[in-house]
């Protein structure tokens, strides 16, 4: 337990919370070419610079699809491509949101399916909103 005198000399430090998706916090001032930190945004637009696969951490085994994305604020991040199959390639314009992938180190963002160049997952019936899939239209009735 510190004495009052010790606390006067060196006060207690505030515990700072680590930001989970830092790239969403910055915006680029194009005229000055400077990054400014603000309130942040829920999504950011970016261009894929590389689309590849990555293997997960120890107990799991798979080839997870990821993309390296250069954001509109100039930062480059690694984002996960959710769902089965995708149409993304280099120079595809995508929208990213925060959200890490637990078994992929360094992947802190998800690509939003069904927006910009990222198509929704084909033939998906349940949990469609997370994968950008439109509702399948009802089978038309036969005419007599």
Curated annotation (Swiss-Prot):
SUPFAM superfamilies in the cross-refs: Nucleic acid-binding proteins
GO biological process: translation
Keyword Acyltransferase belongs to the record: no
3-methylthioaspartic acid modified-residue sites: 103
Database matches in PROSITE patterns: RIBOSOMAL_S12
Annotated segments matching region Disordered: 121-144
One Gene Ontology term, aspect cellular component: small ribosomal subunit
Pfam families for this protein: Ribosom_S12_S23
HAMAP family named among the record's database cross-references: Ribosomal_uS12_B (MF_00403_B)
Stated role: With S4 and S5 plays an important role in translational accuracy.
Family of the protein in this entry: Belongs to the universal ribosomal protein uS12 family.
Protein name, entry field: Small ribosomal subunit protein uS12
Organism: Roseiflexus castenholzii (strain DSM 13941 / HLO8)
Gene: rpsL
